[in-house]
Regions:
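Class I SAM-dependent methyltransferase Rossmann-like catalytic core
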Residues: 7-17, 49-72
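Conserved class I S-adenosyl-L-methionine
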Residues: 80-90, 108
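Conserved SAM-binding loop of SAM-dependent methyltransferases across substrates and taxa
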Residues: 91-103
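Conserved SAM-binding strand-loop segment of SAM-dependent methyltransferases
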Residues: 132-144
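A short acidic, Gly/Pro-enriched loop at the edge of an enzyme's catalytic core
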Residues: 145-157
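A short glycine-rich, Lys/Arg-flanked "PGG" loop and its adjoining helix->strand segment in the class I
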Residues: 172-185
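Conserved beta-strand signature within the Rossmann-like core of class I S-adenosyl-L-methionine
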Residues: 186-193
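Core SAM-dependent methyltransferase catalytic element
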Residues: 228-250
């Protein structure tokens, strides 16, 4: 039996268990008072929805999270020469993808690896070993708020659905600025996040204008939430209905 990689799942088991447990408790309470039947149905339905979403995200026919993640690499206009950084690497899927696509590149992944998600540095290294890219990849614990690298250290920088999760940064645009700080002049970047949530980033046109004011050579917004492969059910605001991507060159 071949050894399998494990890249985790965006839909946590905890939310499925939570909805299921509350739903079961409410079902029991309906025996005492019928009014509990409505919230019971809602929680049981929520449990079923998130269980389906977890299946579809990682191992369903669509392999949705793999395809969404691939958009970051597809939009990175880079030659593959030099060093690349993935901010918030999780279990390392983007690091591995970059290392496999660009055989001459060295790729670094950073993450805070908190207990909220099913990710770890050990899992990253194991996946890189299985995928045959361990010699050209490395992983370290770091915060996206203050990256432990010199200005202009990397030739390419990527990130996928991470910035909105960083609680230490009230202004998520500062995370973009910090990511660009460690990118060389002329280097390529591709960041995907919940860019359509205005309380995080404001209007997308204004966001692009702000990035242009920082002196970037090129910057473009891509509405990846409208990708045809994303099922309509997953385009709800609390799923991936607000994702977008900014790409360009410093």
């Amino acid at each position: 039996m071949s050894v399998q990689t494990s890249y985790g799942n965006w839909v946590s088991k905890r939310i499925i268990y939570l909805f299921g447990l509350v739903g079961i408790l409410l079902v029991g309470l309906t025996l005492l008072y019928w009014a509990f039947s409505i919230p019971a149905a809602l929680f049981i339905s929520g449990c079923a929805f998130f269980a389906y979403a977890r299946y579809e995200a990682s191992c369903g026919r669509g392999k949705l999270q793999d395809r969404i993640r691939a958009l970051v690499v597809e939009n990175l206009e880079w030659t593959g020469e030099g060093k690349a950084l993935d901010i918030g690497c999780g279990n390392g899927p983007l690091v591995v993808a970059l290392a496999k696509k660009y055989p001459r590149a060295q790729v670094v992944g950073v993450d805070y690896w908190g207990g909220q998600w099913e990710y770890s540095q050990k899992a990253c290294e194991r996946n890189a070993q299985i995928e045959g890219v361990i010699e050209r990849t490395s992983f370290q614990k770091a915060s996206a708020v203050q990256l432990p690298f010199q200005d202009g250290y990397f030739d390419a920088v990527v990130s996928n659905l991470v910035f909105h999760e960083v609680a230490d940064a009230k202004d998520k645009r500062q995370l973009i600025r910090e990511a660009l700080r460690v990118l060389k002049d002329g280097g390529a970047f591709s960041f995907q996040d919940l860019f359509l949530i205005k309380r995080f980033y404001g209007n997308t046109d204004e966001l692009v204008s702000t990035l242009q004011s920082w002196g970037l050579a090129e910057v473009e917004f891509v509405a990846t939430n409208s990708s045809k492969f994303i099922p309509r059910l997953f385009k709800l605001p609390f799923m991936v209905g607000t994702i977008g991507l900014i790409k360009g060159r410093k």
